Amino acid sequence: TIVYFLSNQVYAWHKILLVLTILILAPVFIFASRQPVPSLKTLRFDRPPLVTLSGTLEYIEETQVVWEIPISPKAILFIAHGCHGRASFFWDKSPTCAECSGLPEERTITLNALAKGYVVIAISSTRECWSLSNDRTKVLSILSGWIRDKGLEALPVVALGASSGGSFVSALAREYKFKAIVVMISEGSFHKMEIDENYPSTLFVHMVKDERRATLIKNAMDKLRSKGIETHEVKCYESIVTPDYFTKIPGLDSETSHQIQKIFKENGVLDEDNLMTMDGRAMNWMTPLKKK
């Protein structure tokens, strides 16, 4: 899949959403429904998935900022992490980012974005979760200033936010002229804010078994469409945790992945179909691994 651009550097909306959908379709390691989604092995990478990411860490306005610019950049992706996340989770530890840790799903987003020609910049929230009062002014300043300093003003900017970051991005988009946004695992802030026809195209990514959130997202989509805003959704289903599932983690070989999967099955983390028995956030799934 490639990023399509018009000669005037403005995306066609449906093409933006198509590319962004691919960026966020990493396996969802969480309890959802009985229909599996593609694993990482079925996604096409433009370079090996275990390539080392080399983000550059800076502290701008006393805020952690990590970024990476590919050769011949075509667009800019701003990432807002979820609660308890950090910008440094999206890149591998390297000489230019000693604080980076490269979490598997986060680095997959960065990897795919860079491979598609996106400049990637992530900013950490002031506290554990995002809030407009703490982060709005600072992020607007950092993002605008960084893009200007790097001479990237001609590139279109899109945003991806997860959970708390999704709510934050949806609110920030009223002021910052994103070309499109992705709101993951969140209904956004649409229930408490007004929008007009200039609001960017919006893609919601959510888990089908979270019925309450699905209803809220439907309401948000209806509101956006009533203003003529293009909006779509990606429904995430549970992943089958195969014996090789964990080999996508850099440095983790097939034998270790098989052992982890076996321990999970023996301790009730996975059922007979290799599906998680409950929401991973609600189970102490590290305990059986520590015993070994």
Describe each PLM feature range:
Residues 5-8, 15-16, 26-76, 171, ...:
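A domain-start/cap signature at the N-terminus of enzymes
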Residues 71-112:
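Short, surface-exposed "cap/lid" segments of acyl-processing enzymes
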Residues 88-92, 132-134, 171-172, 193-195, ...:
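Short, solvent-exposed loop/turn and secondary-structure capping segments
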Residues 110, 114-129:
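Conserved alpha/beta-hydrolase
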Residues 127-152, 157:
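Alpha/beta-hydrolase active-site loop
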Residues 160-169:
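Gly/Ala-rich beta-loop-alpha elbow adjacent to hydrolase catalytic centers
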Residues 179-277:
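The feature captures the conserved acid-bearing segment of alpha/beta-hydrolase catalytic domains
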